[in-house]
Amino acid sequence: MHRPELKNFRRIVVKVGSSLLIDSEAGEVKAAWLAALAADIAELHLHGRDVLIVSSGSIALGRSRLKLARGPLKLEESQAAAAVGQIALARIWSEVLGDHGIGAGQILVTLQDTEERRRYLNARSTIGKLLEWRAVPVINENDTVATAEIRYGDNDRLAARVATMSSADLLILLSDIDGLYDAPPGANPDAKLIPVVEQVTAEIEAMAGGAESELSRGGMRTKIEAAKIATTAGTHMLIASGKIDHPLRAIANGGACTWFLTPANPVTARKRWIAGSLEPKGTLTIDAGAVTALRAGKSLLPAGVIRVDGHFARGDAVVVRGPDTDEIGRGLVAYDADDADRIKGHSSPDVMSILGITGRAEMIHRDDLVMGAVPG
């Protein structure tokens, strides 16, 4: 199958691992390599692309800054090292992107931020606003509070969740290997790179190997798990070597990599999930003008809501009905039931005075809204 071109994607998540970013001997960032990557990101940014970075390295940097001895760290030691390293990592990304006139915004997430709908919406809104302001979000797992029981444990899967959350259409995993091979390349000189994977099958998963072979496959098992998450959500993914300077430029120029393709797109996949997988917790009845606006692709504003029924929290799914009570669609609501009832019928600027907080302008954002009745 024909491999896509980087220039055809509008929102790209780039995952950078510790081994690429940090010199293991010196315990410091590989400055020249990072400068080259930042130049690649700036090039994409200049041409109107949204770029998000998922960056490892906080624990490794913290160890270096604290001059900790080599060897395994206890959980609380890792968390304390991450606290120091996160400050250093944020400053480094801010400086290298700032050299190109690009602002960077640090976002630290935990597993719950992508699993709980309320927190998911908060994180998604923050990312969306940074991108609207043409900043580059730099995202990492919050290692200072994550525990063994509630954490991603690897940034491949975190990057896939971030891509899903941000409705990215491409996820790039920069690795120490240039893609998926049909056999371990270190042990088999005849191993062949697989340029395109149209579907993650059992055969593809077998090529990635089990946990015991991760070192010889470049941690490929978690990358395949990331591919499953991303492609299910409508996001294409690719694995490419980050060991070279200007790795994104190399991809754009047709360099070696493995593409994982999906027939869906992020918005349709997300809306399919809203329509088919979530049990509605309440109902919003809207006026005729709001019905017309929604059918024209607009978001649902508080002013168009005439009745609120049910007990729902922010982030829950609700049914949207017209004045004749026919179902218009379903969506994820930005307010809980009590607040939605208080602001219904009011213009968005009134929300601050009614609730005492600066709330969302929309009751349901159009990206969180699926039009049409869902069969029972």
Swiss-Prot record:
Substrate binds at S56, D143, N155. Pathway: Amino-acid biosynthesis; L-proline biosynthesis; L-glutamate 5-semialdehyde from L-glutamate: step 1/2. GO terms for cellular component: cytosol. Residues 281-358 form the PUA domain. It comes from the Bacteria. Its main location: cytoplasm. GO terms for molecular function: ATP binding; glutamate 5-kinase activity; RNA binding. It catalyses: L-glutamate + ATP = L-glutamyl 5-phosphate + ADP. ATP binds at K15, S175, D176. Its EC number is 2.7.2.11. Keywords: Amino-acid biosynthesis, ATP-binding, Cytoplasm, Kinase, Nucleotide-binding, Proline biosynthesis, Transferase. It is found in: Cytoplasm. One of its GO terms (biological process) is L-proline biosynthetic process. Belongs to the glutamate 5-kinase family. Catalyzes the transfer of a phosphate group to glutamate to form L-glutamate 5-phosphate. This is Glutamate 5-kinase. It comes from Rhodopseudomonas palustris (strain BisB18).
